[in-house]
């Protein structure tokens, strides 16, 4: 399949630090590569405030359109959340040239669509899409109304708006009803596990930190792993046996893994990202319930990432939004094989409260120490 040619635009304030601007653009590049696009031009624009009509301003927009025509660009991606009228106004200027215009959420939704395997994931993406695209569709209906209605008349476009709203409202209710069935099934499974005495451990982390790799390394589950963002959208659950010398965990309890051991359930789900839009968090809330109700959280961190600390904070912000603040956490610093020297002492000091463990899922290093920490925490 041919790669679509893409222009990337990021609009930042004049107060944005160069390092932060660089990071924002790097992440947008990673998202675009994950989607499968070929980046031909990257543009950073500094503005005090976004342009009301087109976000990037008329002069810059004309410049971008000229470049897009010259470079035979198929998609313009703006690394911000645009208002419906802003993206609508840009689309009107480029639609005859065959160029698509996406904002940051459009791009993430396209990646989600590419990676969705289960019916539930597809439903969640559709729900997020309706919530994101709905206002834009209303804007299109309003434009039809203004064109068809004339002065002092009630045009067919106005009826179109109402029809669109009703259609999307009915579809949203139907999707939420189907998603709730999956959520109820998961709730019943959790209740059964609680009754049997199973402990649950949830793996969270920034996307591409190595969550699925950790699940595979600990349980041999065989979850899909790829060096790209959002490779995993669905919740995967696997059993992990923890050897223990503690006499309290010996015996014939159904949740025990035999003499001197404990079986726990390990779950892995969608990765987080900088400025993860609220509607996406809400759409995936049912699959994130495993994290909300876990007895222990393993926060997987790419220790070789130059933006490691910022990404730790962003994952914690999402957990706070999910109201996961009191659950015990272990920080699992992954990919130690990517560094010649890992600053263990400094990391242990900074994140002492989260019992840091250093591992390489790729080389199966540090996993026994992690198992011990999990057993001790539980």
Predicted regions and their residues:
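N-terminal accessory targeting/assembly segments
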Residues: 1-108
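Conserved nucleotide-binding/hydrolysis micro-motifs of P-loop NTPases
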Residues: 12-16, 47-49, 81-84, 106-109, ...
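Switch II of P-loop NTPase G domains
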Residues: 23-26, 49-65, 270-293, 304-318
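Conserved C-terminal guanine-recognition region of P-loop GTPase G domains, centered on the G4
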Residues: 31, 65-66, 82-92, 285-355
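Canonical P-loop GTPase G-domain recognition
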Residues: 96-114, 120-122, 128-149, 337-378
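Alpha-helical coiled-coil heptad-repeat register
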Residues: 124-127, 131-134, 138-141, 162-165, ...
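Conserved G1/Walker A P-loop phosphate-binding module
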Residues: 148-246, 259-274, 278
């Amino acid at each position: 399949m041919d790669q679509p040619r893409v222009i990337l635009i990021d609009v930042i304030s004049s107060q944005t630090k160069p390092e932060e601007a660089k990071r924002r653009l790097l992440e947008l590049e990673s998202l675009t590569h994950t989607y499968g696009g070929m980046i031909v031009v990257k543009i950073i624009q500094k503005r005090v405030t976004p342009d009301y009509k087109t976000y990037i301003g008329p002069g810059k927009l004309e410049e971008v359109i000229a470049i897009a025509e010259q470079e035979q660009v198929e998609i313009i991606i703006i690394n911000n959340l645009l208002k419906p009228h802003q993206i609508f106004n840009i689309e009107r200027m480029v639609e005859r040239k065959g160029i698509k215009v996406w904002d940051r959420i459009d791009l993430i939704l396209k990646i989600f669509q590419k990676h969705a395997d289960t019916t539930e994931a597809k439903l969640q993406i559709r729900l997020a899409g309706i919530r994101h695209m709905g206002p834009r569709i209303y804007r299109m209906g309003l434009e039809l109304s203004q064109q068809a209605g004339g002065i002092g008349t009630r045009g067919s476009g106005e009826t179109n708006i109402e029809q669109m709203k009703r259609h999307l409202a009915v579809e949203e209710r139907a999707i939420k009803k189907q998603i709730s069935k999956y959520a109820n099934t998961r709730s019943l499974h959790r209740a059964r596990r609680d009754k049997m005495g199973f402990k649950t451990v949830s793996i969270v982390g920034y996307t591409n930190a190595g969550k699925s790799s950790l699940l595979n390394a600990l349980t041999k589950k065989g979850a899909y792993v790829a060096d790209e963002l959002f490779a995993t959208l669905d919740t995967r659950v696997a059993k992990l046996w923890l050897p223990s010398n503690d006499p309290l965990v010996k015996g014939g309890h159904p949740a025990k893994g035999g003499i001197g051991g404990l079986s726990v359930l390990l779950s892995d789900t969608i990765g987080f990202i900088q400025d993860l839009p609220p509607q996406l968090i809400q759409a995936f809330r049912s699959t994130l319930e495993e994290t909300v109700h876990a007895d222990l959280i393993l926060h997987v961190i790419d220790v070789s990432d130059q933006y490691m600390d910022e990404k730790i904070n962003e994952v914690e912000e999402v957990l706070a939004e999910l109201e996961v603040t009191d659950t015990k956490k272990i920080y699992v610093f992954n990919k130690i094989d990517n560094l010649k020297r890992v600053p263990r002492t400094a990391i242990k000091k900074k994140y002492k409260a989260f019992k840091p463990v250093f591992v390489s899922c790729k080389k199966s290093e540090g996993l026994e120490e992690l198992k011990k920490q999990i057993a001790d925490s539980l």
